[in-house]
Amino acid sequence: FLSVLYAQKNQAASTYQLRCCLRDIAVIELLFATGMRISELCSLRPSDIDLENNTVLIYGKGSKERILQLGNPEVICALMLYQDSFKTDISVCGYFFVNKQKHKLSDQSVRFMINRYANLAGIEQHITPHIFRHSFATLLLEQDVDIRYIQEMLGHSSISTTEIYTHVSSAKQKDILVNKHPRN
């Protein structure tokens, strides 16, 4: 999926296409790196993205704030390239992610963007922004991250909400039962 976005960037025939690709890459990278909700992503203000300290301030449901650290250099680079390319538009709009009319990027635009790249990648499964959130949580759980940390990163007030996102894959389940069961 990401390889298609980067290929589109490398094949961009115009400055406009390049800028769109830079924005789309930044959006997808940030969704996957943070597990944030699409509404949280679209509501980000320029001051919420701190690329000196590599943090994102997210305003979640119920006006709950959380700060997430960006640890992946590719995500940080994607955000820097986007920010440099859209600096004027971001300033005019007041939101970090901007559409071609220099307005706040909408939830629907992000959904359309994801569908477009999924089609280009030949992915037949319906891909939604929520899948990035689910994958974020599941992959962290599979790396043995405590579910309470995942709960905090996702902005859930209840651990039971987090548990919905974190189904254990069959491969991980097998590994646990074979290697960690007290009778083995």
Describe the role of every protein-language-model region.
Residues 1-184:
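Conserved catalytic core of the tyrosine transesterase superfamily
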